[in-house]
Amino acid sequence: MRASLDDLRAKILEVSDFPEAGLSFQDLSLLLADRECFRTAVDLLAEWARAKKPEIVLGAEAGGFILGGALAHVLGTGFVAARRPDLPSSEVFRGDWEDEGGAGPLELSAGLIPEGSRVLVHDDLLATGATAQAKAESVERLGGEVVGIVFVVELQLLNGRRRLADRDVHSLIKL
């Protein structure tokens, strides 16, 4: 049986004043632990993304790895991890981001995004749009084409869509 969007929303735990006072962290752990909610989230993201005909799903550490890998499996694509720096890797391409929760670099291993490949960018949460924009720009600098950006949760108050206005963006749950 497929879970509803209300079921998914009910599995998102809000942690107040994290990572700093006045901000809230949206914890998807309960959603991921519930097999029907997990399956529904992946299926709904895939339904939207399938028409984009991606060849690669790119997910950022850490939230984008879990659902991004499952999404790539359902879509029959490869999966590329945008990782935090200083992990063992081959030659890397580095992109930087900054948002309300901090700033930092993201790294992509060179050669994982072939020139002209169609890339779907995924993360668990859209806040300011800074990390999604950094990922999309990194893909494009490497010669890939960003065909869409998908999120499980969108925090509307932070208006991340404004930063991504020129992109095809989809989120399952708007808070």
For each feature predicted by the language model, list its residue ranges.
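PRPP-associated nucleotide enzymes
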Residues: 1-175
